Amino acid sequence: MTTPGKENFRLKSYKNKSLNPDEMRRRREEEGLQLRKQKREEQLFKRRNVATAEEETEEEVMSDGGFHEAQISNMEMAPGGVITSDMIEMIFSKSPEQQLSATQKFRKLLSKEPNPPIDEVISTPGVVARFVEFLKRKENCTLQFESAWVLTNIASGNSLQTRIVIQAGAVPIFIELLSSEFEDVQEQAVWALGNIAGDSTMCRDYVLDCNILPPLLQLFSKQNRLTMTRNAVWALSNLCRGKSPPPEFAKVSPCLNVLSWLLFVSDTDVLADACWALSYLSDGPNDKIQAVIDAGVCRRLVELLMHNDYKVVSPALRAVGNIVTGDDIQTQVILNCSALQSLLHLLSSPKESIKKEACWTISNITAGNRAQIQTVIDANIFPALISILQTAEFRTRKEAAWAITNATSGGSAEQIKYLVELGCIKPLCDLLTVMDSKIVQVALNGLENILRLGEQEAKRNGTGINPYCALIEEAYGLDKIEFLQSHENQEIYQKAFDLIEHYFGTEDEDSSIAPQVDLNQQQYIFQQCEAPMEGFQL
């Protein structure tokens, strides 16, 4: 919840109630899905284990059953597929050597094909259950490993295929294997569980309910090879991921201490997945944000904003951005870590998504108190924001508009005047012609806050002249506001009409400017205008 000071300040100090604190400090709202929930090429939720050529050669040489892969083409094929009748016979034999050989052949099929025959494998009666049975063979760690690999690759498929693995009872056994004496088996179990948890929120919750976290976290206390650490932190991030619904926080929060030291591992993949996990955990109400802060990760997250790999920067920025959606005190923790200089640097990133997310983060800082707005001013960030507002891609301009309008809503007279002197009026006026109604409202609110300040100045100096009216007219803002009186959105045309009437109206003005009123429908009547997709050009 927001601090009482911020709440009272927003609601009492301004007539503009349309920008309430919840809007100003926006969480990951639905309209911003392309920003907040964008598909990330950098992070895969499922991974298929594919053997390297070197591994295949070694395995063929060491094959226990005397069946080399080159012989597959000479075997009798099961009707309509790549699974041979010999493979099926061997998998159900009582010979451990034949069981292992057949399992390796299944694994190779599921590892090497561009489109692995997962459906054919799971539709072969009894095969998946047989692999799950092999997971229990503690006396044969090689068979455990190979069957775990097969099941991992089945679980890398679609949700139906993953569900087959779950229904066969594999998850509790995989969790037991996290404590195996053999690191290969442990690692393959981690991989399988990561794939299952990454399938859906339902699968994630099932894996959590099976009590995966204690043995998974125990893995990090050992000196592991790098691939084990990578797989384990990736699985951990999948356990923290998801919003509809999010995981039960009490079940995932114990991982915070581990994540805090994983941020100091040098490996890029480990860093990236640790940051993603923290971004998921901080994406929620303030009590979750506080738990992340209490884990002591903020300073390191801010440091990682300057990492040389975007694979790390992107999730670190997401986590920092989530933390500043909290209250003023939580936001201040990030500011105290010298985040603004890093954010200023990211505003010039060649990667548009980074620039956009940096603007979003700053917009939540400018929704804070006046001292926090001043720190943004002192960091010389607003000139960069105004430049973005004029030249960047539209989705990034939207975030910059929020940052500037939030500052005009909560800023002092001197702070708002500073923004005007930087030239914020024209780019705000330019946004009045876009098709995105929410951003038109944001721009109107920013201009209204500026006009309100001008009215106060006019009264104070006795001239009666609002100095900002002329600046808005010079930027063709008045023409655009007048045009918005025929906007299809009721809030926009009402706001436009009110601004014209209050700040630009004259006593002898033509009354035809005011819209007609339909007394029966209790609404204004406007002519309908067709708008070009890129916005009106005035």
UniProtKB/Swiss-Prot annotation:
Modified residues (N-acetylmethionine): 1
Post-translational modifications reported in the UniProt record: Polyubiquitinated in the presence of RAG1 (in vitro).
Domain of life: Eukaryota
Purpose: Functions in nuclear protein import as an adapter protein for nuclear receptor KPNB1. Binds specifically and directly to substrates containing either a simple or bipartite NLS motif. Docking of the importin/substrate complex to the nuclear pore complex (NPC) is mediated by KPNB1 through binding to nucleoporin FxFG repeats and the complex is subsequently translocated through the pore by an energy requiring, Ran-dependent mechanism. (Microbial infection) In vitro, mediates the nuclear import of human cytomegalovirus UL84 by recognizing a non-classical NLS.
Phosphoserine PTM sites in chain numbering: 63
Record PTM N-acetylthreonine, positions in chain: 2
Residue window of motif Nuclear localization signal: 42-51
Entry's localization field: Cytoplasm; Nucleus
Protein name: Importin subunit alpha-5
Swiss-Prot/TrEMBL domain comment: Consists of an N-terminal hydrophilic region, a hydrophobic central region composed of 10 repeats, and a short hydrophilic C-terminus. The N-terminal hydrophilic region contains the importin beta binding domain (IBB domain), which is sufficient for binding importin beta and essential for nuclear protein import.
Protein source organism: Homo sapiens (Human)
InterPro entries: ARM-like (IPR011989), ARM-type_fold (IPR016024), Arm_3 (IPR032413), Armadillo (IPR000225), Importin-a_IBB (IPR002652), Importin-a_IBB_sf (IPR036975), Importin_alpha (IPR024931)
Annotated gene: KPNA1
